[in-house]
Amino acid sequence: GARGRPRTVSDSPVPIDVFTSEDLRAVSYTDTNDILKTLVPSFNLGRQPISDGSSFIRPAELRGLPTDKTLVLVNSKRRHRSALVSIGGSGTQGPDISTIPSIALKNIEVLRDGASAQYGSDAIAGVINFILKDADDGFSVSIDSGEFSEGDGAQTTVQANLGLPLGESGFINISAEISEADATSRSEQYCESWFCADPNGASPYNIRSGQNGGDAAFLAGLPSANIGQDSAVVQPWGQPNAEAARFFFNAGYQIDADTEAYAFGNISESESDGGFFYRYPGNGTIEDLRESDGGIYNPLEKYPGGFTPRFFGEVSDFSLLGGIRGSFDNGLNYDFSGRTGESEIRYTLANTINPSQGRASQQSFKPGDLINSETQFQADFNYEFESSFASPVLLAFGASYMDESYEVVQGELNSYVAGPHATPDPFGFCNADMTATTAGMNVIAGGSTLDCANTDDPVYQVVGVGSNGFPGFSPQFSEKYERSSTALFADVSADITDNLFLQGALRYEDYSDFDAETVVKLAGLYRFTDNFAIRGSIGTGFRAPTPGQQGTINVSTRLPNGFPVATGLFPAGGPVAQALGATPLTPETSTNYTIGFTANIAELDLTVDFYRINLDDATYAISTRDVSTDPTSGDAYQNFLLLDNAGVAGANSIGGVLYFTNGFDVSSEGVDIVASYPLNWDSAGSTNLSMALSYNKKAFESDPSAFRNEEAQFDYVNYNPNWRGVFTAAHDINDLRLTARASYWGEHENANSGTSRRQVQDPTWYVDLEAQYQINDTFRIAAGGRNVFDEYPDKGNVGDTCCGRLYESGSVLDWNGSYWFARLTADF
């Protein structure tokens, strides 16, 4: 909470969780994101299949607010953002926490309070600080392997950590992680009457294409529809295939008694792939086309059963930070640092076509890359003044300069180019009066079935442009958005009396692309006794729109009412979005209130903290504006004209337009309760009981109806459970540790505008069990299961589980079932 002076959890004026490496090791996950989800109930994390890049970099939330409202630090220094801007919802762009191997961590500090006045943009919901290991000796290696009870999703992770001395007074600590995970599928066959017919007219639709199904033609085409997955399901819903190699280092060298040089950084490479929506025979993408020789071509020649595009994402992440810290003779402490970081996503789309190119279309495309880069230089100082208070007054102050950029890199030509079939009669076979031209008569003479008088003839068929599922970034919309910012900040704190601690912070930050922001914070703790204290804070905060949110553009497949349509996202400051009413993005601003208490009652440690966050001018994507080439479709046709006039390639294949906007005001309020209690059983060992319980409620504080439809409004407030709890019992006896953990997810609801129906999801408990045994000083084994009772959330029943989907796949509840694992660790 206070710069320059560490404080314990119980005497901090704001709520802080500190998890040691032992705490992290007691969690069965190795992914740092999942570890946080397990330990911090106000940290929610879902899995989003068929969601473009969000399938590979999972956005999270803290205290009911998206991931970009939480500041991420490594060794108390700002972590760079990922290159992913989530297209829907809040358009969140935060750091990719999964690039930090859990074995590299000495501890994790979670500040559950606004801290923009101390750390700058993004620290609205809180701050997560990852502290790296700094041992100068020792070697540890572990291998973890497991599989879901459904028989899929096999995962293997190998981690290692090595500590070495650096000269006579330094260290270098190196961590590595290599992992591989197979895909899962929690789907039923995607089968509808218009493409999965039942010749007997009697079988239920869900067995028409099963092992005993009756549609032989559909079954015969399945192997070509979905490459790389179970060919019996044309559209799998589950986690993607994934593999990764990640490395982190942390180093320090004591130059003299008062001066230390330090550095840390990482390299991470990962690749994932998952499916998109199934294009069934008869879908608008799969149409008869009249080719240049007068013959008819249909994509079913390449894909007899239709096709499911396969989306690949290669994610590269790099960072390097160096600095020097120490103290001057006058007692002024300093810390000078510089950092650079970059995240890049390279996309590949396979098992698809550019429909407008007809028979000439390739089947695999490189639609382009996304790159986020940051460079920052910072100077921190702190000084203690003697005072008449119970402690010296600590003054911390400093300055920062940061450059940021976001680049959309052009895709390969065929991923975005408009082929001949983007326009009717591309080869000039027919006259305006619907008679054959000379070219038309020539192909008819050669045996073509061309009939210019028939409006249904394939010569007039128009199909979509670009690699279907994720059209490439064209030169027109491939650009680099850059900005810089400077900041000045100060923080003062002191124990006013033996019982009262007060802290104040002030920050001024100026951005090159919008006006400056000034934010403040006040916090305090009053200790009534050694065992009981109250604490609270009030502060203002802000989150600057990222260069990615301001500059990104994307056209991808969405499913607003159960059917795939191409949806275009355009920059709020660009001409297309502004023609529809958009204005350039401005910072989100916030006011945070927290009040709570800490208590130590006998062996019981208890903290209770109430909070409220008011967020003004929240960044959100508008509800999709329909687009149609039909002149009778009113506003939808006007939107098409705007796109077409702006020169958007393939405007005729776009079904909707959205953009980010500062749309409305929201609030997030709740309570966090954390408790622990140890039990000693003498010769029978000891048990530590812990509980972390979180309640969160979100609400709109201004009318969002101009930007969000009824379903989006309902889901924003109700989609995630209000209550979430984690209850853990860890029993140690001799060399054996037994851990039982129960995770609770409260009742919640979701709606579907296509059916105007709402579904209540019942409360759900997941139970994890694990046993660890220390074989000797070197080897330790562990085995157990997550969700051992194989619980699932309720199946969807309001019409938004189209296309073989059984569960609300965007839910924060896991829907993959039970997972069983074993782990071997060696410490040298």
Segments and roles (model prediction):
Residues 8, 16, 36-81:
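Extracytoplasmic beta-strand/coil segments of soluble accessory domains associated
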Residues 615-616, 743-751, 772-828:
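C-terminal beta-signal and adjacent terminal beta-strands/loops
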Residues 299-301, 307-320, 329, 340, ...:
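Outer-membrane beta-barrel transmembrane domain signature of Gram-negative proteins
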Residues 34-35, 39, 58-60, 73, ...:
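N-terminal periplasmic accessory domains that precede
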Residues 397, 499, 611-753:
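Gram-negative outer-membrane beta-barrel transporters
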Residues 150-305, 309-323, 327-328, 503, ...:
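Transmembrane beta-barrel wall of Gram-negative outer-membrane proteins
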